[in-house]
Regions:
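A surface-exposed beta-alpha-beta supersecondary segment
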Residues: 79-103
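Terminal intrinsically disordered, low-complexity extensions flanking WD-repeat/beta-propeller proteins
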Residues: 91-92, 121-182
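Canonical WD40 repeat/beta-propeller blade segments in eukaryotic WD-repeat proteins
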Residues: 1-4, 42-50, 88-95, 132-138
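Conserved strand-to-loop turn within each blade of WD40 beta-propeller repeats
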Residues: 14-17, 61-64, 106-109, 149-151
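C-terminal transmembrane module of eukaryotic multi-pass membrane proteins
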Residues: 104-111, 117, 135
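Per-blade loop-tip surfaces of WD-repeat and WD-like beta-propellers in eukaryotic adaptors/scaffolds
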Residues: 7, 16-40, 69-79, 114-124, ...
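Residue-level detector of Asp-centered blade-edge/turn motifs that repeat once per structural unit
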Residues: 6-7, 53-54, 98-99, 141-142
Length: 182
């Protein structure tokens, strides 16, 4: 697994669920400029690594019910985010919000779970009519839109509630758009 920082100058490589190596793209052939070693949870494998859009944080997702938030360039563990379900041992996506203030994760219970990145405290659970495990969560980096998916796609926008403004929108889990306050 690998991820570029928002500037596109540094990339992180997660190796064998044990270490993260940071490389500078201008001199990656010289090897990593920093390596961090971790153990997350026994029985969990890492499934993803991501930088926050402000470049200050990284997250490690797992096939367990744990997301780890790290300081991006010192490698210091900040928070372990838990409280969501992954009782199937599958890859569940988590994403930073565009302002880097929150992490949102899917869950095998069909819900989305939200945590603050400054405290690690869970601040909300969103129910969006997903009938299967929510395995993907992504944010539009410029507009206030979040997408979540199981076998169907839900689009979330600020404003609260399910809307059926013209043109009519169907709600999830049928193909369509779900609007919910984020």
């Amino acid at each position: 697994m690998a991820s570029f920082d928002p500037e596109g100058l540094i990339f992180a490589v997660a190796v064998q669920s044990e270490q993260i190596k940071l490389y500078d793209v201008r001199s990656f052939d010289k090897g990593p400029f920093s390596t961090f070693k971790y153990k997350i949870e026994s029985g969990c494998d890492w499934t993803g690594v991501k930088f926050s859009l402000d470049g200050k944080l990284m997250m490690l997702t797992t096939n367990g019910a744990v997301v780890r938030v790290l300081e991006a360039f010192e490698g210091k563990p900040m928070f372990t985010l838990s409280g969501y379900q992954n009782n199937k041992g599958i890859h569940i996506e988590a994403s930073f919000t565009p302002d880097s203030q929150f992490v949102v994760s899917g869950s095998t219970d069909g819900k989305l779970h939200l945590w603050r990145t400054d405290t690690g405290q869970r601040v909300g659970i969103l129910s969006g009519e997903h009938s299967n495990p929510v395995t993907n969560v992504q944010f539009n980096p410029r507009f206030a839109v979040m997408a979540s998916s199981c076998q169907s796609l839900c689009l979330w926008v600020p404003g609260g509630g399910v809307r059926s403004d013209p043109p009519p929108l169907s709600s999830c889990p049928e193909p369509g758009t779900h609007r919910q306050r984020v």
